[in-house]
Design a protein with these regions (language model features):
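Active-site segments that bind and position negatively charged phosphate/pyrophosphate groups
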Residues: 209-339
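Glycine/serine-rich anion-binding loops at beta->alpha junctions
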Residues: 95-111, 145-151, 283-286
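Short glycine/serine/threonine-rich phosphate/pyrophosphate-binding segments
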Residues: 24-27, 50-53, 80-83, 105-110, ...
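ATP/NTP phosphate-donor binding region
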Residues: 2-97, 350-351, 378
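Short Gly/Thr/Asp-enriched flexible loops that form oxyanion-binding sites at enzyme active sites
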Residues: 56-57, 87, 106-120, 153-154
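C-terminal charged capping/lid subdomain of soluble metabolic enzymes
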Residues: 2, 311, 321-399
């Protein structure tokens, strides 16, 4: 009997992409064309100030005749407390458009500000804890400075509650930005570590979709495999020279495509590795990309036998593995992926990540308990993992 074909799907990608050099100077006119009058500008650390980017963006807002307010200080693994404070200021300002100038954490915070400003009666954590549903929001624009999360076109956003050390994601079409300005030159100042984290994150957004039990989904598979080959090739260049415009262009565009849904259309998604990583980021404040690279090899080694042929296909098409035996090919593909992460100077186990301090088996069990929402949920679909499976994966990674 024929295997099940691709699943039915709905794909919604309303984000306008403005790609190329000097495009950040169009921010004001773009916001104005979407009806903006009072723009709330969100950014992270001092790099956008030191580089002059923030001045360029605010100048474009002034030239467009728009009123604006800025707020800086977003940190990696965006904090709920900061987002709440930003919402208060945004409401007081009378914001009708939110502009993110930064990477994934800044964009996710901006999405939270947009939801909170449009729903002043609701605490934003209610949306992330799934107690309330987003039914209205403000438009968000993006000036991207970091190729990684893909939040500039995605329907997702994450926040970390520092009080409870819980990191949660929210998926809704209200999260999709109205426009994304993407100038690869804005990534030139990134430290090597952030470039590596970005490459890992981009790969993971596709890998977490690629490893699926869904069969006969040829075009989506080819798109995913092509994206992965492109990122692997250009990531090796960018990690040595982040001023390589061609390499950074390919990586930046791949980051958007990897998380706007296209690399997993028609297939059941897995995303177990992201859930495993979120628990690490929440507890230890490790960079998102690094949290994923520490645990991917352990996850892959634990689950590949649920369908060795899928991992073998990945190994042959992405890594050019010639091994005929599916199990051996699968294992070789996993080794090559982990070795690639290491070549980017990314941690591939907990012991290589200085932020992660799991010293006892009880601590590992506690992490698994948290990741499984205290034993109330499973993660993944390629191989459904319960609390014990999560514990075994963390234990493998804790070497």
């Amino acid at each position: 009997m024929e295997e099940e074909a691709m699943h039915g799907f709905t794909q919604y990608t309303p984000t306008m992409i403005i790609f190329g050099k000097e495009t950040q100077k169009q921010a004001g006119e773009l916001a104005k064309s979407l009806g903006a009058t009072k723009v709330f500008v969100v950014y992270g650390g001092g790099s956008v100030v030191r580089s002059g980017l923030l001045d360029q963006v605010t100048a474009s807002l002034q030239e467009a005749g728009l009123d604006y307010m800025t707020i800086g200080g977003v940190k990696p693994n965006p904090r709920l407390s900061f987002a709440r404070e930003a919402v208060k200021k945004s409401i007081e300002f009378g914001t009708d458009f939110v502009l993110a100038v930064g990477g994934g954490s800044v964009i996710d915070t901006s999405k939270a500000v947009a939801h909170g400003t449009a729903n002043p009666e609701t605490d934003i954590w209610e949306f992330w804890s799934k107690k309330q549903t987003v039914t209205k929001s403000l438009p968000v624009g993006v000036v991207l400075t970091l190729a990684a999360a893909g939040s500039e076109t995605s329907d997702s956003a994450v926040l970390t509650n520092e009080d409870t050390k819980i990191k949660r994601g929210l998926s809704t079409d209200f999260n999709r930005p109205a426009f994304a300005i993407m100038n690869p030159e804005l990534t030139y100042t990134l430290p090597k570590y952030q470039v590596g984290c970005g490459v890992v994150d981009i790969m993971m957004h596709t890998l977490d979709r690629y490893f699926t039990q869904t069969e006969n989904n040829e075009l989506t598979d080819e798109i995913a495999e092509g994206l992965l080959r492109t990122v692997i090739r250009n990531g090796a260049v960018a990690i040595k020279d982040s001023h390589d415009y061609n390499a950074m262009s390919e990586i930046m565009w791949a980051g958007s495509l990897s998380h706007n849904g296209i690399t997993g259309l028609g297939a059941e998604k897995d995303f177990a590795v992201h859930q495993l990583g979120h628990e690490l980021s929440a507890k230890f404040d490790i960079a998102h990309g690094a949290s994923l690279s520490t645990v991917w090899g352990a996850w892959a080694a634990y689950v590949y036998d649920a369908k060795p042929a899928r991992f073998a296909q990945y190994a042959r098409r992405v890594w050019n593995v010639e091994e005929a035996d599916d199990v051996k090919a699968a294992q070789e593909g996993i080794k090559k992926t982990v070795a690639y992460f290491a070549s980017l100077d990314m941690p591939t186990s907990f012991s290589e990540a200085t932020e992660i301090g799991l010293k006892t088996d009880e601590e590992v069990k506690k992490m698994a308990h948290g990741c499984s929402y205290e034993g109330t949920r499973t993660i993944g679909s390629f191989k459904v993992c319960d609390e014990n499976d999560i514990y075994e994966i963390y234990k493998l990674a804790n070497k």
